[in-house]
Amino acid sequence: HFTYTTALISQASLFEAHERYLDLHIVLSGCEQVALAPVESLDEAEVRADEDSTMYRGTPEYSVTLDQNRFLLVFPGEGHLPKLSDSVPMNIDKLVLKIPC
């Protein structure tokens, strides 16, 4: 369970991707943008093997809007950059479930 304030897309930082888990993102309140790109199009920045997480730099191929009516399932090899807003920063209450694959 996470609570945070989104950042503007122009202030975006690192994408994250996993090898052993799917991420199920469920927004409980608020609205956020999640930028997405295949890891093959990104540059590796940092490996966090103990967290099954690799961080990447790069440009999003597309983004999706998450709110209480939409969820996002992110598969291994999909770079994702959550916690974004395209206009005004918003307060978000969200669950992220890690599903072994």
Show where each model-derived region lies.
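Short, conserved beta-strand element in jelly-roll/cupin
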Residues: E19-Q33, P38-E40, V47-R57, K98-I99
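Conserved metal-binding segment of the jelly-roll/cupin
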Residues: T65-L84
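Short, surface-exposed secondary-structure edge patches
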Residues: L24, Y62-V64
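A short secondary-structure junction signal
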Residues: L36-P38, K83-D86
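Short acidic (Asp/Glu) patches
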Residues: T3-E19, A49-P60, L81
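A short hydrophobic beta-strand segment most commonly corresponding to one strand
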Residues: L24, F71-L73, P89-C101
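Conserved short histidine dyad/triad with adjacent acidic residue
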Residues: H1-H18, L28-D43, P76
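Short, surface-exposed beta-strand-loop junctions and turns on beta-sheet-rich folds
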Residues: E40-L42, H80, P89
